[in-house]
């Protein structure tokens, strides 16, 4: 049995290239014939005549050899062309009986269930919004959804679901619209029950109509046993302007399969008011974690970032999406997803968007019940007025709290640092408070307070105040208290400013049974 794999189209292309090369060589040989076969003697003497005759004999021998080589080349090209034709004919002959066999197998399943046993689902036609066909029950990927009709605001078709093995189809894109809202994207199809990737959600359509909204992105499909959830689609842009114009929200990420991760949320669409980022999909029961939230859309007012997905039973929470940039106001960051129900760390909060009035950072996600660290708070955005940092998440029964996010830098005022998350009940240290944001012409931001410790553990340190040039310096945050055994957190340092110096943070109390109080923060020297 031969294990050679042939591609007829490549063989045909190679034969054409060889034929072209042969034609070029033949033309060159013909052009060289006249000056090399009949060479005139340089003089009438015997030596010149003999030399001319010798070179002429060489030219004649080359021409004879060239004729033989041309014949061999032509035979080789003919053989290669015939081989390509034979392979193509064999493939065409094999397709018909195989397809007939598949049709016979699929017929009873189509009749009873409206779905084949083997084979991919049909794609929806572009411009129709048709749903993609479902893949074969045993094996086959779902078809992609068709896009909406351009200019109509029609929703995109949903992607088809896969069978036991196969990938879910992607959702179709929503249609644009000049007289209303953009069309929503289609949802992604579910991945194969045993194995396969879930389909992504379709992107929302844009609009140019006054005070209209872009289409929402489609949700990602759900994963199978071992598959991750599909990513959500991007929200459509709203380009018509107006007070009510808003970008489409990003699609939610798909839920992960039993052992799969959640899908990422889609980004919000651009507009005067940016769309909200899609939420990350929840992780499967035994999956690695939830999906990250989508970024908020850009605009005069940035969109809020999507929240991260939860982590199933034992996974990590997904990170919150960053807030969208804005010329006037930035979007707030999304909250981090909660850790797994049993154990798992919380996801980090998303950063606030940059703007004149910057967005606040998202709060960190709480850890799982038994064990895990709380997620860190997101940093506040920077701009004219810096955004506040997000608070850290709470730790599990055994686990430390998450750190607070730093306040954003602002030319007119710095943002406040986020509070550190409290530790779990039994064991763990409190999270550190975030530092206050710096400023040039306004007050510096105050530092965040440190989180409280568990029964055994240390309190979190307070964040330092933000420095400034013209305004008042930020105050340091207080340190977190210990509980039974452990040292209290140190207070944050005060910052200097031309209009005054902030207060120092007070150290947290030490443990009731053992542990020293935290030290107070320092004044600037």
From Swiss-Prot:
GO CC terms in record: cell surface; extracellular region; host cell cytosol
Region (Disordered): 506-525
Domain PE, chain residue ranges per copy: 1-93
Superkingdom per UniProt: Bacteria
Pfam families, alphabetized: PE, PGRS
SUPFAM superfamilies documented for this protein: PE/PPE dimer-like
Main location: secreted
InterPro entries on file: PE-PGRS_N (IPR000084), PGRS_rpt (IPR048996)
Gene null: resulting phenotype: Deletion mutant is attenuated in vitro and in vivo, and shows enhanced MHC class II-restricted antigen presentation during in vivo infection of mice. Also shows a reduced capability to inhibit autophagy and an increased acidification and lysosomal fusion of phagosomes during infection of phagocytic cells.
Biased composition (Low complexity): 514-525
Localisation per UniProt entry: Secreted; Cell surface; Host cytoplasm, Host cytosol
Keywords assigned by UniProt, alphabetized: Host cytoplasm, Secreted, Virulence
Job description of the protein: Contributes to evasion of both innate and adaptive immunity. Inhibits autophagy in infected host phagocytes and inhibits major histocompatibility complex (MHC) class II antigen presentation by mycobacteria-infected dendritic cells. Has an important role in the growth and survival of M.tuberculosis, particularly during intracellular growth and in the later chronic phase of infection.
Stated family: Belongs to the mycobacterial PE family. PGRS subfamily.
Record protein name field: PE-PGRS family protein PE_PGRS47
Organism: Mycobacterium tuberculosis (strain ATCC 25618 / H37Rv)
């Amino acid at each position: 049995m031969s294990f050679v794999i042939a591609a007829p189209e490549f063989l045909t292309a190679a034969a054409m290239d060889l034929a072209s090369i042969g034609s070029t060589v033949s033309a060159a040989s013909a052009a060289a014939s006249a000056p090399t076969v009949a060479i005139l003697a340089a003089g009438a003497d015997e030596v010149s005549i003999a030399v001319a005759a010798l070179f002429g004999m060489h030219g004649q021998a080359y021409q004879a050899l060239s004729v033989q080589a041309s014949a061999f080349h032509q035979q080789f090209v003919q053989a290669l062309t015939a081989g390509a034709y034979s392979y193509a004919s064999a493939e065409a002959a094999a397709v018909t009986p195989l397809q007939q066999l598949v049709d016979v197998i699929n017929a009873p399943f189509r009749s009873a269930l409206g779905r084949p046993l083997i084979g991919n689902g049909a794609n929806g036609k572009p411009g129709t919004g048709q749903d993609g066909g479902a893949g074969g029950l045993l094996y086959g990927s779902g078809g992609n959804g068709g896009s909406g009709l351009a200019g109509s605001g029609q929703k995109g078709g949903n992607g088809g679901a896969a069978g036991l093995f196969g990938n879910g189809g992607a959702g179709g894109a929503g249609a644009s619209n000049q007289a209303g809202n953009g069309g929503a994207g289609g949802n992604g199809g579910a991945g194969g029950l045993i194995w396969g990737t879930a389909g992504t959600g379709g992107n929302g359509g844009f609009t140019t109509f006054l005070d209209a909204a872009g289409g929402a992105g489609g949700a990602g499909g759900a994963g199978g046993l071992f598959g991750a959830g599909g990513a959500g689609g991007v929200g459509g842009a709203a380009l018509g302007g107006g007070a009510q114009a808003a970008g489409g929200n990003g699609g939610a990420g798909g839920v992960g399969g039993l052992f799969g991760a959640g899908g990422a949320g889609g980004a919000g669409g651009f507009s005067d008011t940016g769309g909200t980022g899609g939420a990350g999909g929840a992780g499967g029961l035994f999956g690695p974690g939830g999906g990250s939230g989508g970024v908020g859309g850009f605009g005069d007012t940035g969109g809020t970032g999507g929240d991260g997905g939860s982590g199933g039973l034992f996974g990590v929470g997904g990170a919150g999406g960053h807030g969208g940039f804005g010329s006037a106001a930035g979007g707030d960051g999304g909250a981090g997803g909660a850790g797994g129900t049993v154990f798992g760390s919380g996801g980090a909060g998303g950063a606030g968007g940059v703007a004149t009035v910057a967005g606040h950072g998202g709060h960190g996600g709480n850890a799982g019940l038994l064990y895990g660290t709380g997620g860190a708070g997101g940093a506040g955005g920077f701009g004219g007025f810096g955004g506040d940092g997000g608070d850290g998440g709470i730790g599990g029964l055994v686990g430390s709290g998450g750190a607070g996010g730093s306040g954003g830098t602002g030319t007119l005022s710095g943002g406040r640092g986020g509070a550190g998350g409290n530790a779990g009940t039994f064991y763990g240290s409190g999270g550190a408070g975030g530092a206050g944001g710096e400023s040039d012409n306004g007050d510096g931001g105050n530092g965040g307070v440190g989180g409280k410790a568990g029964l055994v553990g240390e309190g979190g340190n307070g964040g330092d105040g933000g420095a400034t040039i013209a305004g008042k310096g930020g105050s340091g945050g207080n340190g977190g208290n210990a509980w039974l055994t452990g040292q209290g957190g140190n207070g944050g340092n005060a910052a200097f400013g031309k209009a005054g110096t902030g207060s120092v943070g007070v150290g947290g109390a030490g443990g009731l049974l053992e542990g020293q109080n935290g030290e107070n923060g320092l004044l600037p020297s």
